Amino acid sequence: MQEWAIDESKVSLVKAGLSSEQGRMNCTFVNDDPLRHGLAEAPDEATEIDERISSAVWTLDAYLAGKPITFLKADVEGMEMPLLRGAEETIKKYKPKMALCVYHYPSDLYEIAEYVRQLVPEYQFRLRQHAPLFGDFVLYCHV
């Protein structure tokens, strides 16, 4: 935290997910994957299951309950659109600067930029590739 000059008193870790609806989400972790990716659905019968967990899922609007934000960074492995749908009121009201990953699905760049522009027409966009290889595109949004 010190490296990024972040005030630790303003950071909290929450064991929950963010999406367009509140509820619970089941994740299955398989031990044949060295990265232990969580899966929303159980893998096929041939895969050895290492762990299953159920986690709370919130909308960002409900979690923040009207508290202001100035910056939103999201690299949530393809769940960027559901996260943004659950943050609609927060984005409209506070117009935070945003750094949104747009490389998980081919349609991400267009759909995410279009959705953000629908919410706040004043948003401007910058696209940056952070890795030397193709991919890892981040869409920066600011008013």
Regions found by a protein language model. Name each.
Residues 1-143:
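Phosphate/nucleotide-binding beta-alpha loop and adjacent structural elements of enzyme active sites
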